[in-house]
Amino acid sequence: MNVLRSGIVTMLLLAAFSVQAACTWPAWEQFKKDYISQEGRVIDPSDARKITTSEGQSYGMFSALAANDRAAFDNILDWTQNNLAQGSLKERLPAWLWGKKENSKWEVLDSNSASDGDVWMAWSLLEAGRLWKEQRYTDIGSALLKRIAREEVVTVPGLGSMLLPGKVGFAEDNSWRFNPSYLPPTLAQYFTRFGAPWTTLRETNQRLLLETAPKGFSPDWVRYEKDKGWQLKAEKTLISSYDAIRVYMWVGMMPDSDPQKARMLNRFKPMATFTEKNGYPPEKVDVATGKAQGKGPVGFSAAMLPFLQNRDAQAVQRQRVADNFPGSDAYYNYVLTLFGQGWDQHRFRFSTKGELLPDWGQECANSH
């Protein structure tokens, strides 16, 4: 009898282990060990101040949701509210930068906002509310999205509603500065369900992406002037690099059913062509001339996985990621890998409406 009981226990343990294994996302588990404190702070160790950004917190929340890791999601959310939003994301946008000051105090280093982190945070909260059936997340996400619309969206003559990179420092009387990587088209589509200004922003965001890449390479930053339009031949060379790499990744993650995806892929085809020809994405490209220099780091290769349509070219970048997987001191490369490789491994997809389609599996639906 004891032998039978022992055998049954062993079988149950093996079954439980197999379910856990099916639910585990190894890259996410390693990211938590290397980059997230027990309290829920996503740390960038490459900076001497051991900084945390609202971007990092938002990417952590997205990854936790995609991994069905509710405990991590709650920790990251709680730390963000308590340390970046003075206790409530309903009442204020999160400060974008937190870390160690010269006097050794740990606190907010820059209270300005960063809309790339803000929109991912709002979207992750809204989707967490839907998928985990938790009204609290929905309420916080809705309030945050309304605050983004009030504090970070402006009306630009000749364009319409546009998302500023932050609430302070990007708008002058007749000039506005934008970052094309800050609002992924999939999120822009998702937010249209909330009405103005998001219905307009989806269209103007498409213009930002399509009209600022004359040679097929998106700029990290670009300026728009009243009556003059996009300033693509600025005094200072416009570069496509560490910010813009996300543009190609976001475009690649658009569902094939989105009628704008083919147009976007075609606009940025030179980036795909360069990567296919050379075996790696460029680190920097002159937006005006299309001249590339340097070899992009491993995170760039991960970001290209959703974007590349050629399977052989995908395989080359997939192998480059596997051979050079980010370590414990490469925050940005790692988050790009969570997105790009995670998508490539079918750990998540996005619907035509911009909703998350996680690959939790039926047996994983309640695992946190």
Curated annotation (Swiss-Prot):
Question: Pathway it belongs to?
Answer: Glycan metabolism; bacterial cellulose biosynthesis
Q: Where does the secretion signal sit in this chain?
A: 1-21
Query: What EC number(s) does this enzyme carry?
Result: 3.2.1.4
One MF term from GO for this chain? Answer: cellulase activity
Query: If you read the UniProt record, what top EC class would you report for this enzyme, in one word?
Result: hydrolase
GO biological process terms on file: cellulose catabolic process
InterPro entries in the cross-refs? 6-hairpin_glycosidase_sf (IPR008928), 6hp_glycosidase-like_sf (IPR012341), Glyco_hydro_8 (IPR002037), Glyco_hydro_8_CS (IPR019834)
Q: What Gene Ontology terms describe where this protein resides (cellular component)?
A: extracellular region
Protein location:
Secreted
Chief place where the protein resides: secreted
Identify which residues the record assigns to the active site: E55 (proton donor), D116 (nucleophile)
Q: Where are the transmembrane segments?
A: none
Task: Report the catalytic activity.
Answer: Endohydrolysis of (1->4)-beta-D-glucosidic linkages in cellulose, lichenin and cereal beta-D-glucans
Its keywords, alphabetically, are: Carbohydrate metabolism, Cellulose degradation, Glycosidase, Hydrolase, Polysaccharide degradation, Secreted, Signal
Q: What does this protein do?
A: Hydrolyzes carboxymethylcellulose.
- Return the similarity comment: Belongs to the glycosyl hydrolase 8 (cellulase D) family.
Q: What else is known?
A: The genes bscA, bcsB, bcsZ and bcsC are constitutively transcribed but cellulose synthesis occurs only when DgcC, a putative transmembrane protein regulated by CsgD, is expressed. Cellulose production is abolished in E.coli K12.
Name-wise, this protein is Endoglucanase
Q: Which gene encodes it?
A: bcsZ
